[in-house]
Structures are given as C-alpha cells and as structure tokens.
Amino acid sequence: VHIGGRPDPLRFTGVDTPETVDPDQPPECFGAEASAHTTELLPVGTAVRLTRDVEARDRYDRLLVYLERAEDGLFVNLDLVAGGWADDYPYPPNVAHQRDFALAASRARTDGLGLWGTCGDADTPVG
C-alpha cells in the first residue's frame, strides 16, 4: 500500500496466509495461489479503506490492517479466510473480527476450500 506516495508494508490483521517470500524457506503450500488471488482482488491502483484494531504496527513495522476494497466494500481479510486462501490467526489484542474469521475458517476447512483441499491434512493448512 502507498501512503503519502510512499510504499508502506502491511499485514492483514487476523489472518495467516501461506508464506511466499521468506528467503530461507521454500514457499508454503498454496502460497502462490493465495498471492495470485490477493493480486486479483487488489490490482495495482485499487482504492482501499484501511482500518486498524488496537495496535497500528507489528514487530516488523508493518501496518496491521483490516482492508476493504473501496469500490464495493469487500472485506478482504474475511474473503481470504472464507475462500480458504488463508487461515484465521488471532493476534491479541487485535481481535475485533476474530469470531467472524474463526467461523469462516471452520467453514472453509469443512468444505475443503483452497489450501484446506490442496495441502493435505485438513488440520494443517500450510507447510
């Protein structure tokens, strides 16, 4: 995301997507697909609304955000979990939407969506 014309890295609060950019590890199962889906949802130039929970940044200085696509209000964090592109990830004290994320993750897991139907053990989303 760009704020004031400068890039500022972010993390979607409350969700855990498979890792794809750790230089010391191979990409995790379904990581490329989750990244492609996110890029499809948010092509360069997409207007978004960012909201935060309790904390503004994580220990890596990334913005912790709930992200909505401005044109239609799509709640991207929830979309990622509901489609099986990510798992829910409680990050206290930033838990305003955690109940919704946990329910969406449970449904995606039960239905075998996304990473849950691709990465083997239904209780182990990535790795």
Predicted segment positions?
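Small beta-barrel nucleic-acid-binding modules, primarily SNase/OB-fold domains
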Residues: 1-127
